[in-house]
C-alpha cells in the first residue's frame, strides 16, 4: 500500500512531484533542507519548517512557525472552510444570474412579458440567496471533495427556467392574467431556490435544516402578509394544481441533472492515464 524511499536525490524528488501532477493530482511537498528546494518549488503547495534552511523557507508557500507538522490539519481545514463557503455561496448567486439570463432570452425570443416585478425578485433574493448564504457561511465547512460551482448552479437554474416558462405558456394561452402569472412564477421560483439550497448545502445537518426551513417559512409568510406590496394576487384551482405539480417535480429534476453532471465529470477524470505514476515508482525501485 505504501512506498518508502531512502537517499532520494533532489532530481528524483522533483520527478515524483511531476509524476503525480501529470495524473491530475494537487501535490503538497514538505521539506526543511536545501536538497528539498527543487521539489518544493515544483509542488502546488510547498511546506517548510521554521527550523529548516533559509532556502527551503524562502521557496515555501507555508512555513510552520512551531515546526510541528501536526498543525497542518487545522490549517487545511480552515482553508477548506473558506473555499467551500465561498463556492456554495457563489453557486446560489450564479443560479440567479443563469436563470435570469435564460429567462430573459426566452421572453425576448417568444415576445412575452418578463414574469417578475423587481420587488418580487427582492423577496426571492433575500429569502433564498442573501440571508441563508450569509448565515450558512458562518458554519464550519471542512468537506474534502469540493463541488464545482457550475455543477451546483446549472441544474437549479435550468429547472427554474423550465418551470417559469411552463407557467408563462399556461397563463398566455389559458388565463391571460399578468397578476396570476407573476404570483405563480414567484411561488414556483422561490420553492425551487429552496430546493437548490438543499442540494448545494447537502448533507443537511440540524443547523442547515433550521436555516433552510426557516427561510421557506419566511418566504411564504411574506408572500401572504405583503401580498399587495409584492403585487401578488390569488390563484384559481387549476393554477394551484399546476404550481403544486411543478413544486413536486422540480426537486427531482434538480437531483437528476446534478447526478448526470457529476457522472460526466467522474467519467472525464477516469480518462486520465492511471499508470504513469506507478511506472515511475517501478523505475525508481529498479
Where are the regions that the model predicts?
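Membrane-embedded transport module
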Residues: 1-28, 43, 48-208, 217-228
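Residues immediately C-terminal
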Residues: 35-36, 133
